[in-house]
Amino acid sequence: MSRVTIDPITRIEGHLRIDVEVDQGHVQKAWASSTMFRGIEKILVGRDPREAWLFTQRFCGVCTTVHALASVRAVEDALNLEIPLNAQYIRNLILIAHALHDHIVHFYHLSALDWVDVTQVLKADPKKASSVAESLSDWTGNSTKQMEAVKNRVKGLVESGQLGPFAHGYWGHPAMKLSPEVNLIAVSHYLQALDYQRYANQVVAMLGGKTPHIQNVAVGGVQNAINVDSSATLNVDRLVEMKLLLEKVVGFVQNVYVPDVCAVAGFYPEWFGYGKGVT
């Protein structure tokens, strides 16, 4: 019996450690643990509490905004402050835009490659893949032409020997169950998701000053100038622009993300029972 420790686990949000006991190549027991302490807690000691949100959002480069707002709310609660309604609206818009970005990135760009075999795309029939995708939703990005373009792109990467973001995967592993066509759909949507997560992040940056790590929050509200007649501030034109960006992202989530999650999950029903934990 040997013990293997993997720390840290990559392609996740946060910190994760896995310990496993292996006997003749078979995992007998496994433990998952997360490191809660990051060290920023020590940095904050003795500092002005109004600065805390600037530091705490550095916990993560993906889920940054929620740490900033949780921190500033903690200070506001301690001071018994109520923020203006417009400030709450702006914070809410930042949070929802960030949540949309975060879910898209987490599924497609962090988690999906544990379930999707990129190299199997080379065996896929683009026409069949398009037919399967169109049976799930009426998304315009599911055409045969789109699937052919993605297959050719992956073929070029494989033939070059430089897989880029798809390097070092467990390609060909028997635990991967998706058909070649579903793999092609997933990779196609992986690439499309790069654009849609960016649209959501644009909204965060437009309101927060930049992303990652927004700059507009303050204890007691936000630091956004609002003037409907000035192009240099938050005005109606900017709000309309953000609305259009969010509508694009919502369309992708409803017609691509949700069907993809359900489709991939359907190939791995046994995983719903894993990870129950030990006592």
What do the PLM-derived regions correspond to, one by one?
Residues 1-279:
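Active-site bordering "gate/hinge" segments
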